[in-house]
């Protein structure tokens, strides 16, 4: 979908720098080039030329590049002027370009939007551009690059292909009911459906990990009063973020700290001690604590290793786990190793990671840091996954829900028409991720968050 408009924007950050770039895209790009450099540019040839004002005055000199449609980032004719990075010089050159009739300033993200509309990128790849620019760690940058190269989109397209294949099979069974073989009951459709559910679950798990890399992992510290939750928050934050006393119930409200471990973002949340409180303010704090726990990506359950009654610790753990939603991962921390004599360590016990440490002396805290880093998907190699956004997770979640509904329609009600409709809905949700089925409002929200010039 080629636009009739020609847009221009500064592609390098505002301010002074060694190099400044102005990017022009649209049908008037070559006309702009002729107006500025007074020469017809050959595609993909670098030209070192003076950049001239309307009266012929030289504004700057630098490199002019021409990318002819469709072999450009946007799929349109694109011209770049690469000159000196002084903001005054760039503003003068921008003013000159805007004097060409029909050229206007680009909106934020409009170059990427044109690339999407011209099928140079799908929506997930376009979003990956912004994620690559904003990556806060090497791992996030590598994963964003994989998304930009189409890794995430490839997985989504494979799911869509599987859905289309299954839809075709189901609708054929509906259209030819008089065949000797009952295709809805022979087990093949159910087998394909179960395979599809498994494929989707795997992609959802990878997308969840990718979302954590992008947005950060929410870690809630929970446990009984005086277990050392606030001390652990301070140890992880590297500062006295929370008040620490020997008085049980000191923390009444939720405390939040945003930290980075090797560039990986974490949102650490300290909560009120969990117990049967009589004080109204403390009860409110405990309610808020549970609200945070239920929304966590991971929970650190703090236990006081100096408690002489091991059964009491086991009971505290059992009570907590019985109230916890089953899909939230838990790390158990046995605190106060400096007082109990336990050696700082990390091990797996009964399906949980158990870490022994002292939040007060910070002995063993490095073990917890490394564990949290690995939980976020940190990898020491060069290979990474892909980045995902919250809207991607929501679309995958909706798709999974409708696959489960479809399985019920097939196995319990033998309703092929209803299964076919659920598969159509699943295909639409998956299409939202790559932009095959996306509202204009959503597109506007996505691209408006980009930098101008991208």
UniProtKB/Swiss-Prot annotation:
Main EC class the enzyme belongs to: hydrolase
Annotated positions binding K(+): 226, 245, 247, 250
Entry-linked PROSITE patterns: G_TRME
Record-listed (6S)-5-formyl-5,6,7,8-tetrahydrofolate binding positions: 23, 80, 120, 454
Enzyme Commission number, as recorded: 3.6.-.-
A Gene Ontology biological process term: tRNA methylation
Record domain TrmE-type G: where: 216-377
Residues binding GTP: 226-231, 245-251, 270-273
Obligatory cofactor(s): K(+)
CDD domains in the cross-refs: trmE (cd04164), TrmE_N (cd14858)
GO molecular function, one term: metal ion binding
Localization per Swiss-Prot or TrEMBL: Cytoplasm
Parts forming coiled coils: none
Cellular component terms per the entry's GO annotation: cytosol
Binding site for Mg(2+): 230, 251
Cofactor binding summary note: Binds 1 potassium ion per subunit.
Keywords: Cytoplasm, GTP-binding, Hydrolase, Magnesium, Metal-binding, Nucleotide-binding, Potassium, tRNA processing
Similarity comment: family membership: Belongs to the TRAFAC class TrmE-Era-EngA-EngB-Septin-like GTPase superfamily. TrmE GTPase family.
Subunit structure: Homodimer. Heterotetramer of two MnmE and two MnmG subunits.
Function: Exhibits a very high intrinsic GTPase hydrolysis rate. Involved in the addition of a carboxymethylaminomethyl (cmnm) group at the wobble position (U34) of certain tRNAs, forming tRNA-cmnm(5)s(2)U34.
Name of protein: tRNA modification GTPase MnmE
């Amino acid at each position: 979908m080629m636009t009739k408009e020609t847009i221009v924007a500064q592609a390098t950050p505002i301010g002074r720098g060694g190099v400044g770039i102005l990017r022009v895209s649209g049908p008037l790009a070559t006309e702009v080039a002729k107006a500025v450099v007074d020469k017809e540019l050959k595609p993909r040839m670098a030209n070192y030329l003076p950049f001239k004002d309307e009266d012929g005055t030289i504004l700057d000199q630098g490199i002019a590049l021409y990318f002819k449609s469709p072999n450009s980032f946007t799929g349109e004719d694109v011209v770049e002027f690469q000159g000196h990075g002084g903001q005054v010089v760039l503003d003068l050159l921008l003013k000159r370009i805007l004097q060409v009739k029909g050229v206007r300033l680009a909106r934020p993200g409009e170059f990427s939007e044109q690339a999407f509309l011209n099928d140079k990128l799908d929506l997930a790849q376009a979003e990956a551009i912004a994620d690559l620019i904003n990556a806060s760690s090497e791992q996030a940058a590598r994963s964003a690059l994989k998304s930009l190269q189409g890794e995430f989109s490839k997985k989504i397209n494979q799911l869509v292909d599987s859905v289309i294949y299954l839809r075709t099979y189901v609708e054929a069974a509906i259209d030819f009911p008089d065949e000797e073989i009952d295709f809805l009951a022979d087990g093949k459709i159910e087998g394909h459906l179960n395979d599809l559910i498994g494929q989707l679950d795997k992609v959802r798990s990878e997308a969840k990990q990718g979302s954590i890399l992008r947005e950060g992992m929410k870690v809630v510290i929970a446990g009984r009063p005086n277990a050392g939750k606030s001390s652990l928050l301070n140890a992880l934050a590297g500062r006295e973020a929370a008040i620490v006393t020997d008085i049980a119930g000191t923390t009444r409200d939720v405390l939040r700290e945003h930290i980075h471990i090797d560039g990986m973002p974490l949102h650490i949340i300290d909560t009120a001690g969990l117990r049967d409180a009589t004080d109204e303010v403390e009860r409110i704090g405990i309610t808020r604590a549970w609200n945070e726990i239920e929304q966590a990506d991971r929970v650190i359950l703090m236990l006081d290793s100096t408690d002489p009654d091991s059964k009491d610790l086991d009971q505290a753990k059992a009570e907590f786990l019985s109230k916890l939603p089953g899909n939230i991962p838990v790390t158990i921390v046995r605190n106060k190793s400096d007082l109990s004599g336990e050696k700082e360590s990390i091990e797996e016990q009964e399906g949980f990671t158990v870490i022994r440490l002292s939040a007060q002396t910070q002995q063993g805290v490095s073990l917890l840091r490394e564990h949290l880093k690995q939980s976020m998907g940190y990898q020491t190699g060069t290979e990474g996954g892909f980045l995902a956004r919250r809207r991607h997770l929501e679309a995958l979640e909706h798709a999974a829900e409708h696959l489960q509904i479809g399985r019920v329609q097939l196995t319990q009600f033998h309703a092929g028409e209803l299964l076919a409709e659920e598969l159509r809905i699943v295909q639409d949700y998956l299409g939202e991720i790559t932009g095959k089925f996306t509202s204009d409002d959503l597109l506007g929200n996505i691209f408006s968050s980009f930098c101008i010039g991208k």
